[in-house]
């Protein structure tokens, strides 16, 4: 070996290789955090559900199933497709995020008002007056969506799935504690309203705080056509999934008594519990990787 070889500087990997290695490390970390915490969160949710099932009556679950049809439908229209579009266009900057925030507020305030107006009609369809009161209170959940979706978009742009996962764990624990506390307090079907609201509200506050995404919304939607088009396409495709999965509740809810529907939905939940165990959402990670301009996970 010559003296020149001894004094030569070590080879430095090209910047492209360094960036690719860093991104692979981010993806591995994200898979671990999302998979592990999602399994933990679902185990917490299932544990509280099994305890609450022993306390509430089948009629409580039947009434909740009737309202869930509306919640599932409007949940597909809550604007998360717009957030995914903003993640894909990560060079949009803060102005695009402010537009996204404004668009989410408009959509979810509209859903809130619409659900309140439709509540008496849904109650009349199911012949259960209490359904109207349940839907009016459940409509408040939509007001948490703009904050949660904005924080989700900011953190996903940064490939920061660790803080998202931590927020999800905390919100799952709070929701489980709320469900058990309300059930033991004798709140009946309102237990199934309070627990999801606590989960969504805590997740919204935690996500937007973790993302440090506090900003004023923009209601000037000029140039937001790409966001609206992408999000609208996603929502339209999900409508078919809604029709496939909720048709039985729509029909059975009008035909069966609440306690009979409660037996049906609880049995359906228990029979599908293993299938519903989703270990992470690696599809999200692959999509983020793709938008960073790479083709394979290495």
Can you say where each PLM-predicted feature lies in the sequence?
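Membrane-water interface segments that mark the loop-to-transmembrane alpha-helix transition
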Residues: 14, 25-45, 67, 72, ...
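Membrane-interface helix-capping segments at transmembrane helix termini in multi-pass transporters
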Residues: 21, 25, 53-67, 89-100, ...
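Membrane-interface junctions at transmembrane-helix termini in multi-pass inner-membrane proteins
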Residues: 27, 85-94, 144-168, 190, ...
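Residue-level signature of transmembrane alpha-helical cores of multipass secondary-active transporters
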Residues: 30-38, 68, 104, 137-138, ...
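Alpha-helical transmembrane segments of polytopic membrane transporters and translocases
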Residues: 50, 59-78, 140-141, 248-250, ...
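Helix-loop junctions and terminal segments of transmembrane helices
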Residues: 77-94, 156-157, 267, 271-298
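Hydrophobic alpha-helical transmembrane segments
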Residues: 132-139, 167-213, 226-232, 260-271
């Amino acid at each position: 070996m010559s003296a020149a070889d001894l004094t030569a500087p070590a080879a430095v990997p090209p910047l492209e290789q360094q960036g690719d290695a860093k991104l692979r490390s981010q993806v591995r970390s994200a898979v671990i955090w999302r998979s592990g915490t999602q399994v933990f969160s679902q185990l917490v949710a299932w544990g509280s559900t099994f305890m609450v099932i022993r306390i509430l009556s089948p009629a409580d679950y039947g009434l909740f199933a009737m309202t869930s049809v509306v919640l599932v439908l409007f949940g597909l229209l809550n604007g998360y497709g717009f957030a995914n579009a903003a993640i894909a266009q990560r060079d949009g900057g803060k102005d695009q995020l402010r537009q996204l925030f404004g668009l989410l507020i408009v959509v979810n305030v509209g859903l809130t008002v619409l659900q309140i107006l439709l509540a008496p009609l849904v109650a009349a369809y199911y012949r259960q007056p209490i359904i109207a009161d349940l839907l009016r209170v459940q409509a408040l959940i939509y007001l948490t969506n703009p904050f949660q979706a904005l924080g989700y978009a900011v953190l996903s742009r940064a490939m920061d799935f660790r803080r998202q996962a931590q927020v999800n764990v905390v919100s799952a624990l709070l929701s489980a504690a709320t469900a058990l506390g309300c059930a033991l307090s004798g709140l009946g079907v309102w237990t199934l309203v309070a627990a999801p609201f606590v989960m969504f509200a805590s997740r919204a506050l935690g996500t937007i705080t973790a993302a440090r995404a506090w900003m004023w919304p923009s209601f000037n939607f000029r140039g937001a056509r790409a966001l609206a088009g992408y999000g609208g396409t996603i929502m339209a495709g999900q409508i078919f999934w809604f029709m496939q999965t909720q048709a039985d509740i729509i029909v059975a809810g009008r035909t069966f008594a609440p306690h009979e529907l409660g037996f049906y939905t609880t049995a359906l939940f228990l029979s599908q519990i293993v299938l519903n165990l989703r270990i992470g959402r690696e599809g999200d990670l692959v999509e983020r990787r793709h938008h960073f301009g790479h083709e394979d996970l290495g």
